[in-house]
Amino acid sequence: MLLLLAEYLQQFHTGFAVVQYLTLRGILGVLTALILALCLGPWMIRTLQIRQIGQAVRDDGPQSHLSKKGTPTMGGALILSAIAISTLLWADLSNRYVWTVLAVTLLFGAIGWVDDYRKVIEKNSRGLPSRWKYFWQSVFGLGAALFLYMTAQTPAETTLILPLIKTIEIPLGAAFIVLTYFVIVGSSNAVNLTDGLDGLAIMPTVMVGGALGIFCYLSGNVKFAEYLLIPSVAGAGELIVFCGALIGAGLGFLWFNTYPAQVFMGDVGALALGAALGTIAVIVRQEVVLFIMGGVFVMETLSVMIQVASFKLTGKRVFRMAPIHHHFELKGWPEPRVIVRFWIITVVLVLIGLATLKLR
């Protein structure tokens, strides 16, 4: 929006041309979303408290969590609002990737909002029934996959790239739709499973989102892409604005979500942010790198799958409680220790993911 205004104002002063620079708009995206989140956060928390929109706590979970009962939830709406406003202000709104990622984010956020609403407002412990949750996730995930497949301008946009073996490219054809569906929906649910402790999900999301922003910038630049042997995706660079907004909104939310949390993001935030990461990774053809950098999300998801499978097959549990962050709590780790150690793991994994740019 402001890019169009700057282009118009260039006829009066050439200084407005600076707004065209992607890096500047990425930084402005961070700052705008951060300021919005910090300014709107206190108002949203008060509103949630007044309306008694508070978190329910499982009785069979760690005893330390009982004090969290009633903490305002659905704070993910703050994150999504800051991301959307900042992106609409600073991104090139003629870019199809910007609209794709923004649409997927908000649509998955809508699924989470309905789930949270039923749990918190209607006091329905089931929330949105799983079959309907996965149905709408599938509808929106497949919709995004079909759109990206149908609008692909080069074979590289639907080719699977393997880090460290960049000379091997696997044309996916229609299988691209299937892979994209699983990446988006899987990433959405993985982040949601991770969102169980104060700040546990949002900081890894910010770090992975920032790293994906670097991939977007490099993939959108033909020279960088050719030099690094990564797919050149015209227009992908514009997603650095969205990634910047995600970073700013995430850090602003963390201000209130850090231990002890004043607000939780709820499904409205977790499902949306996970879907956003998955969609961006698909666009820049870095699904495998997302799997690496989002290792904490993968670990949380696998712990649930292993726990369920083990209990159904043997009647025994592998972990004291799943997702795995609760296992460590029940082992006696204080909540802040679990959180920070998972953050440290993410820092290492993100650095490994970025290192694949040069390793070949």
From Swiss-Prot:
It is a multi-pass membrane protein. The keyword Cell wall biogenesis/degradation applies. One of its GO terms (biological process) is cell division. Its cofactor is Mg(2+). Keywords: Cell cycle, Cell division, Cell inner membrane, Cell membrane, Cell shape, Cell wall biogenesis/degradation, Magnesium, Membrane, Metal-binding, Peptidoglycan synthesis, Transferase, Transmembrane, Transmembrane helix. The keyword Electron transport does not apply. GO terms for molecular function: metal ion binding; phospho-N-acetylmuramoyl-pentapeptide-transferase activity; UDP-N-acetylmuramoyl-L-alanyl-D-glutamyl-meso-2,6-diaminopimelyl-D-alanyl-D-alanine:undecaprenyl-phosphate transferase activity. One of its GO terms (cellular component) is plasma membrane. The chain crosses the membrane at residues 25-45, 73-93, 97-117, 132-152, 167-187, 199-219, 236-256, 263-283, 288-308, 338-358. Catalyzes the initial step of the lipid cycle reactions in the biosynthesis of the cell wall peptidoglycan: transfers peptidoglycan precursor phospho-MurNAc-pentapeptide from UDP-MurNAc-pentapeptide onto the lipid carrier undecaprenyl phosphate, yielding undecaprenyl-pyrophosphoryl-MurNAc-pentapeptide, known as lipid I. This is Phospho-N-acetylmuramoyl-pentapeptide-transferase. The gene is mraY.
